[in-house]
Amino acid sequence: MPPFEVKIEKLIYGGDGLAHHEGATVFVPFVLPAERVAALPIEQKKKFIRAQPETILEASPERIAARCAHFGVCGGCNYQHIPYSQQLEFKAEILRETLRRIGRIDWTGAIATHASPPWEYRNRAQWKIRPAEGAALDVDADEDDARQEAGRAKKEQAKLNIGYFRANSTALCAVEDCSILAPSLLTALLALRQALARGALPLALREIEVFGAEATAASPAKL
């Protein structure tokens, strides 16, 4: 299905924009309400379409430049194109709609938001490990079987990369930096990248989940 134009009606839980096209509900990430978008379908069902924003045809005046170079490809976060104060407003409205739609609670009162720092706040992450894009094995055919197998494993492991899944995909988005990770977790991510490059991690490893506590005078950083 070729790209088609939609106008984003609102944001929903998870950060996707919601629109409609020829009777189908359309979900598009990394957009804002009232934006006109050329949407490229990546999954099509009878009643809904998941799409990627191929082009922002008419941008919201609220849109800002994302801090992270991976934003728009990486599926690790959804709101960097929105000012932080407005992110909180959208999330409060999403909660209000969820209460109404699922809980049958029509809450018209204020919803207090508890803001955290907009950057370097995430102290839990799930990183995926997959072969680097374009990686191919190159093992000397003259080596004996044992050495060849060891060399193959070492080279294959060294060509793995670490990051997050791409948005709406199970393909890897390898990252060298992450603006929302707590500093202790970013340090761990970079150390794991180096360990992969050395072939120092188990070949079968495909996912790492981490939880970090930031260092204080009374409590050193731990992972």
Describe each model-derived feature in a short phrase.
Residues 1-223:
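Accessory RNA-recognition modules of RNA-modification enzymes
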